[in-house]
A protein has these predicted regions:
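Glycine- and acidic-residue-rich phosphate-binding/metal-coordinating active-site segment common to enzymes
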Residues: 22-51
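C-terminal catalytic subdomain
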Residues: 47-138
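Short, conserved beta-strand edge motifs with alternating hydrophobic and charged residues
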Residues: 12, 22, 67-69
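Catalytic core of PPM/PP2C metal-dependent serine/threonine phosphatase domains
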Residues: 1-20, 55-60, 123
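Short acidic/polar capping segments at secondary-structure boundaries
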Residues: 6-8, 17-19, 25-27, 35-36, ...
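Generic structural hydrophobic/aromatic packing signal, biased to beta-strands
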Residues: 1-2, 19, 30, 131-133
Length: 138
């Protein structure tokens, strides 16, 4: 999860997936996605020990751009060698959001759904695919 205001930003994470954010210096992945003890094992907010596993990141800067995603698109969204944001994945989304008219914004949920269920994406993952995007508007 993420909370951001003019006074700062708080990012919270438990489990896999991730939150990519631009705090004014380019996209970054402040928290490394968690992995369980075994492959395909993760931690959930409903686990008894969730509070002790919760990872947090704080900044005194507001978030200009945010993308939160589930593990199903993690390999598309991140450079897995160094857990950095894969810019060719995020740039079209953020550029589209920044320049979209209201009519185009109304179409984005359906277009995002089509993209996430497309053959090109499904060839690379068979896991759940969720992507939430946000921009700070002046």
């Amino acid at each position: 999860g993420l909370i951001s205001s003019a006074n700062g930003t708080l990012i919270m994470q438990i489990g896999d997936g991730g939150v990519v954010v631009d705090l004014g210096h380019g996209l970054q992945l402040p928290l490394t996605p968690m992995v369980g003890e075994y492959a395909n094992m993760t931690h959930f907010i409903t686990d008894e020990d969730a509070v002790s596993r919760l990872d947090t990141f704080t900044s005194t800067e507001r978030a200009h751009k945010v993308a939160a995603f589930t593990d199903g698109i993690q390999r598309l969204a991140l450079n897995m060698l160094d857990n950095s944001p894969h810019m060719p994945f995020f740039t079209p989304f953020f550029n589209g959001l920044a320049s979209a008219t209201q009519e185009q914004l109304d179409l984005l949920p359906e277009l995002l759904k089509q993209f996430l269920s497309s053959p090109a994406v499904n060839e690379r993952t068979d896991d759940d695919k969720t992507l939430a995007l946000a921009l700070w508007l002046p």
